[in-house]
Design a protein with these regions (language model features):
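N-terminal short beta-loop-beta anion/metal-coordinating cradle
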Residues: 1-47
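General beta-strand structural signal in soluble alpha/beta enzymes
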Residues: 14-19, 36-38, 61-65, 82, ...
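Non-transmembrane, aqueous-exposed alpha-helical and coiled segments at domain scale
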Residues: 20-22, 50-51, 58, 88, ...
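Flexible, glycine/proline-enriched loop segments at strand-loop-helix junctions
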Residues: 36-40, 95-106, 154-158
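Hydrophobic alpha-helical segments and helix pairs
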Residues: 43-83
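Phosphate/pyrophosphate-binding betaalpha-module
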Residues: 67-125
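Active-site rim beta-loop-alpha module in soluble metabolic enzymes
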Residues: 104-156
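A C-terminal functional module that forms or caps the active site or interfaces directly
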Residues: 148, 153-173
């Protein structure tokens, strides 16, 4: 099931894609053309769609909206998290493009724009690193501190999700 909750915000929305069952609608928002599209879950899925959007359709920017599991007691359900980096143990980026670092960073200009827009709209955002993992639910462990506690404490990760590292490393090529 895709989250199509943004469609009502578009004027004159038209279905423009059904390939692989992934729906995309294009319309206008404040007079500017905007496309809203599902991406599936995980780096391989967003990898397919983001690659095609950037390389074949020449999109200007992708803003990923999705869910994350909190590593911080400060983050509550429905809070908005602005990623200042994505940390990952995944080998997806290395296999896909040769990117062999465990952390990627967003566009400063795009984050500045998101921050300014949120401020103008009165939306509170929590900012910090996030953990971009191939595994959303890990098996319980007797290890202390746990893997996620290390990421939270040593790398400052606020939450776990499964797509951001790929989205951010796409900015490099």
């Amino acid at each position: 099931m895709q989250n199509l909750s943004l469609i009502p915000f578009l004027q004159d929305a038209v279905l423009v894609n059904e390939v692989r069952g992934m729906l995309a609608y294009t319309g206008t928002y404040n007079g500017k053309p905007v496309t809203v599209m599902g991406s599936g879950m995980g780096m391989p899925s967003i990898g397919i769609y983001s690659y095609e959007l950037f390389k074949e359709y020449d999109v200007d920017r992708i803003i990923r909206i999705g869910s994350a599991g909190s590593y911080s007691s400060d983050a509550k359900i429905y809070d908005v998290v602005l990623a200042t980096s994505a940390v990952s143990e995944s080998t997806y980026a290395k296999v896909q493009s040769g990117y062999d670092k465990d952390e990627s960073y967003p566009s400063k200009a795009l984050n500045d724009s998101l921050r300014a827009t949120a401020k103008r709209l009165g939306i509170n955002m929590i900012e910090g690193a996030i953990h971009s993992s191939d595994v959303f639910y890990r098996q319980p462990s007797d290890e202390k501190p746990t893997y996620w506690e290390k990421l939270r404490d040593e790398r400052g990760c606020l939450a776990v999700e499964m797509e951001a590292l790929h989205c951010l490393q796409m900015l490099l090529y």
